[in-house]
C-alpha cells in the first residue's frame, strides 16, 4: 500500500522503518511466545530519540507534535512490531508537558529523553470504575505537615509497571461528596515506582491473553512527596484528559499501522496462492473485502490526522473518540 505523495512525514517513516528492519518478525514472535518484553527494541527506539519525539528540544527531546509521534507508532506496527510496549511514554507526556511546573519538567524530561528514566505507566482505572473515571475511590490525603500525600486504594489493568521507573497516578484529594462537580477533587501525581514498591504499593500481575503485561496495584499508606503533585490540587481530571486524548490518537495510529501491515501481507499472499490454475487474488470475492479494508484504513487515517491537528493546536478534542473507533 503506497503512502500519499508527497508525504511530509516520509523522512520519519523511512528512519523508523530502517530501525525496525533490525527487529524482524522472528524477534517479535519470540517475545510474544515467551510473554516477554522487547527490551532491545525499546532501547533502540529510545537511543534513536523516537520515544522523546514530543519532549521539547530544551529538555533533550525532538520537539515534535502528536502528528509526528503518531507516525512513529504507526510505522512500528506497520513493520510488524508492537508499539503497545512503549507507547505509554508518548501519551503520558501530554499531562506532564502541559501541566507540570518548570522545576518538574527540568527534573523529569531530560532523564526521560535520554532513557535514564522511563515513564510508561498511568494509574487511572479501578476495579469498580472503568470508563466513569469521576467515581474513582483511591484517595490521596495531604499530611498535617503538608510535605506529602498519603495514598490508599486500588488500581487495575495498569500496564508496563515492571518496565517503568515512574507512573502518573490519578487519585481523589477531595471526596466526591464534597465537590460541586464530580470531575473536581482529583489530582495527578508522579510516583517513583521503585520506591513505592518498598513503601506501600503492592503489584499483582494479572494473567491475560493481550499483547503486554498488566497488573493490579494496591496502595496502603503510600507516601508521595507534595512536590510530586502536577499542577493544581483538584484539577487532575482535566489534566489527565491531555494524556488520554494523546493515548487514543496514538492507538488509532497503531491500528492504522496494523491494518496496513495486514493489507500488504494479504495482497502478497493472494497474488502467490494459486488455485485452479490462477492466483486467488484474481477472484472478485477475494478482492472486494481487501478493497473495503483499504478504504476503511484510509478513512481512519484522515480522522487520525484531524485529531492530531486538534491536539497540537490545543483545541477541543471531540474528534478523538471517533479516531480511536
PLM region spans:
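Glycine-rich phosphate/pyrophosphate-binding beta-alpha loops
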Residues: 129-130, 156-161, 209, 246-250
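Alpha-helical interface subdomain recognition
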Residues: 1-84, 91, 99-104, 115, ...
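Cysteine-centered functional microenvironments
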Residues: 123-127, 152
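Flexible, small-/acidic-enriched active-site or ligand-binding loops
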Residues: 135-137, 195-225
Amino acid at each position: 500500500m503506497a503512502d500519499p505523495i508527497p508525504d511530509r512525514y516520509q523522512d520519519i517513516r523511512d528512519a523508523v522503518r530502517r530501525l525496525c528492519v533490525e527487529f524482524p518478525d522472528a524477534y517479535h514472535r519470540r517475545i510474544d511466545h515467551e510473554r516477554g518484553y522487547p527490551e532491545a527494541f525499546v532501547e533502540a527506539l529510545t537511543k534513536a530519540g523516537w520515544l522523546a519525539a514530543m519532549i521539547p528540544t530544551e529538555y533533550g527531546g525532538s520537539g515534535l507534535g502528536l502528528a509526528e509521534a503518531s507516525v512513529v507508532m504507526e510505522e512500528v506496527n506497520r513493520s510488524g512490531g508492537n508499539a503497545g510496549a512503549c507507547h505509554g511514554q508518548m501519551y503520558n507526556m501530554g499531562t506532564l508537558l502541559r501541566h507540570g511546573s518548570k522545576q518538574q519538567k527540568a527534573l523529569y524530561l531530560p532523564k526521560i529523553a535520554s532513557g535514564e528514566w522511563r515513564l510508561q505507566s498511568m494509574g487511572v482505572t479501578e476495579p469498580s470504575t472503568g470508563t466513569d473515571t469521576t467515581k474513582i475511590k483511591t484517595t490521596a490525603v495531604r499530611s498535617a505537615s503538608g510535605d506529602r500525600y498519603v495514598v490508599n486504594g486500588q488500581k487495575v489493568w495498569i500496564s508496563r509497571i515492571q518496565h517503568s521507573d515512574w507512573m502518573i497516578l490519578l487519585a481523589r484529594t477531595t471526596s466526591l461528596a464534597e465537590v460541586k462537580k464530580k470531575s473536581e477533587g482529583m489530582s495527578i501525581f508522579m510516583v517513583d515506582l521503585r520506591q513505592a514498591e518498598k513503601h506501600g504499593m503492592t503489584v499483582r500481575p494479572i494473567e491475560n491473553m493481550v499483547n503486554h503485561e498488566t497488573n493490579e496495584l494496591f496502595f496502603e499508606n503510600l507516601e508521595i512527596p507534595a512536590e510530586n503533585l502536577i499542577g493544581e490540587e483538584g484539577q487532575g481530571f482535566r489534566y489527565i484528559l491531555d494524556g488520554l486524548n494523546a493515548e487514543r490518537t496514538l492507538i488509532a495510529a497503531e491500528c492504522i499501522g496494523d491494518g496496513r501491515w495486514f493489507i500488504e501481507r494479504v495482497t502478497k499472499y493472494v497474488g502467490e496462492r494459486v488455485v485452479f490454475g490462477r492466483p486467488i487474488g484474481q477472484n472478485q470475492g477475494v478482492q472486494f473485502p481487501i478493497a473495503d479494508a483499504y478504504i476503511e484504513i484510509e478513512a481512519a487515517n484522515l480522522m487520525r490526522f484531524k485529531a492530531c491537528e486538534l491536539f497540537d493546536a490545543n483545541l477541543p478534542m471531540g474528534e478523538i473518540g471517533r479516531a480511536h473507533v
